[in-house]
Amino acid sequence: MAHVSLPHDAKAGPTKSEVRAVLLSKLDLTPTDHFAEVGSCTGAVTVEAARRAGRVTALERKPERVETSRKNLAANEVGGSVELRESEAPEGLPTDADALFLGGSRNYEAVLDHAVEHRIDRVVMNVSRLEVAGAATAAFRERGLLDEVVQFQVSHGYELAGATSFDSQNPVYMLVGGAGEVAADGGKAAMDDGGAATDGGETSTDGDERVRGTERSPGDSTGGGRR
């Protein structure tokens, strides 16, 4: 995974590199794709997406974060393929996007409605709070968008008393689906009767259903959720 330089601070942590790796594997961006992002913040995901997609439209409602994203894009020599828009989604979202990422939960239901209306093929949303993850899973399912829900946690090792201990980050819930071919079955192939599946293709978070084991692991990603 190519290095992402983030010399400018948005007073909000960027999406961690390990989370970006999983995110990008799910988005599966190609040079012909138009990628839309809700909440560019520091621009970490924006930079990664611009290295893969043909076009990127990134929305950010806070002007100071738009400027931070702009500076970090320049620091990574990312230019003409990215359009930064100071706007609060769903206002300002393109109507021809192939893939969409929601880095937070603000106005997410209206954004999902936009994805359905404009048949966005791949939709991924990152959530850090359990209660929001449950509500968002229901919103994805109600709109026929849900393909899978992945929950994972990153831990980094550090030396402690001559041995290795681990510092764990908060869990991330990643909702994956789309309104195009990716989730044309409304998620039925991924879910039995309802509930959120965990990573690994086995059991759900409530333990009563199974999801197909076709998703790629973080190790399959070519590169590497809050940005």
Regions found by a protein language model. Name each.
Residues 162-194, 199, 206-227:
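Core SAM-dependent methyltransferase catalytic element
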Residues 63-99:
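S-adenosyl-L-methionine
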Residues 42-53:
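Conserved SAM-binding loop of SAM-dependent methyltransferases across substrates and taxa
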Residues 55-60:
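Conserved SAM-binding motif I beta-strand of class I
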Residues 116-173, 225-226:
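C-terminal substrate-binding/active-site "lid" region of AdoMet-derived donor-dependent transferases
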Residues 1-31, 36, 41, 67-74, ...:
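Class I SAM-dependent transferase core
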Residues 107-115:
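A short, conserved alpha-helix within the catalytic core of class I
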